[in-house]
A protein has these predicted regions:
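Serine-hydrolase catalytic machinery in alpha/beta-hydrolase-like enzymes
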Residues: 27-129, 226-238
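C-terminal catalytic histidine-bearing segment of alpha/beta-hydrolase fold enzymes
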Residues: 40, 206, 211-263
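Short alpha-helix in the alpha/beta-hydrolase fold that links the catalytic acid
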Residues: 70, 194-204
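Alpha/beta-hydrolase fold nucleophile elbow
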Residues: 129-140
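Gly/Ala-rich beta-loop-alpha elbow adjacent to hydrolase catalytic centers
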Residues: 139-143, 147
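A conserved short beta-strand
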Residues: 156-166
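Short beta-strand/loop motif that positions the catalytic acidic residue
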Residues: 184-186
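Acidic catalytic loop of the alpha/beta-hydrolase fold
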Residues: 189-193
Length: 263
């Protein structure tokens, strides 16, 4: 998989932001287990005094232009958006090899992954303009896996959205802990997520009595929302404009169900 650099991605993301929003951003330091983490907060200063919050978890490349752009896009839509830092301050992979190594630490230690996402959720909930009972979490690739783990931990969030995330779980019985609504947006031709993994997730969610949706996009592979992934499906990860547009709309509609007062 290609490492996300963010140039084309950021331009595309920001082009769709509402023009009248006044988005304010800042870097936020917080901690988990003695590690210093550095997230990115975005809010619309022209909006209501209190708003729903959206936690965003990055792909394997860490906090960078792409996830920051998504945070700004969500802020312009009226949410307080916080891009979590799972890796830690200063850990910003520069190559695919470095990104794979960083992500592997958390993929192989789901307890640590959950702790890092929970710390970011707590930081978002501390923001004075966030409606504490109206929070959703979204994630891309590695981050999609992370928000599903957040749900499996029993976290008090309204919903989670996984964009082309890994769907495997070493503890499928934890599906019974899920209180959030779940939306999984998946590339039907993603070679990194076998059909058996999709089926196992469906069984897990059914077994837990979860309110869930799984949408598969034909012709889409891994990283279908990330323009910098390129256009060659044969590499297993590639941008798909239609799937990007449709999956974002699916998320927007999902949020409208979660937060009807914010419409």
């Amino acid at each position: 998989m290609r490492l996300e650099r963010g140039g084309a991605a950021l331009a595309l993301v920001l082009a769709s932001a509402p023009a009248r929003a006044r988005v304010e951003t800042r870097v936020v330091e917080y901690q988990e287990g003695g590690a210093v983490l550095e997230g990115y907060l975005a809010r619309d200063t022209a909006g209501p005094a209190r708003k729903p919050g959206v936690l965003i978890v990055h792909d394997w490349s860490g906090v960078g232009p792409y996830v920051k752009g998504r945070a700004e896009q969500l802020a312009a839509m009226g949410y307080v958006a916080f891009a979590a830092d799972i890796y830690g301050k200063g850990v910003r992979p520069k190559t695919a090899k470095e990104a794979s190594a960083a992500a592997s630490i958390y993929r192989s230690d789901r307890k640590l992954m959950r702790a890092r996402v929970a710390a970011a959720l707590a930081e978002l909930r501390r923001q004075p303009d966030v409606l504490g009972n109206e929070i959703a979490a979204i994630g891309y690739c590695f981050g999609g896996t992370a928000v599903l783990e957040l749900a499996r931990s029993g976290a008090d969030v309204a919903g989670v959205v996984s964009f082309h995330g890994g769907l495997d779980s070493p503890t499928p019985a934890d599906g019974k802990n899920i209180r959030a609504r779940v939306l999984v947006l998946h590339g039907a031709d993603d070679p990194f997520v076998p059909e058996a993994q999709v089926k196992a997730l469906e069984d897990e969610l059914r077994g837990g009595g979860v309110d869930w949706q799984l949408v598969e996009y034909g012709g889409a592979v891994h990283s279908f929302t990330i323009p910098d992934a390129g256009s060659d499906n044969s590499k297993g990860a590639a941008y798909n404009a239609a799937a990007d547009r449709r999956s974002w709309k699916a998320m927007v509609d999902f949020f409208a169900e979660l937060f009807p007062a914010a419409r």
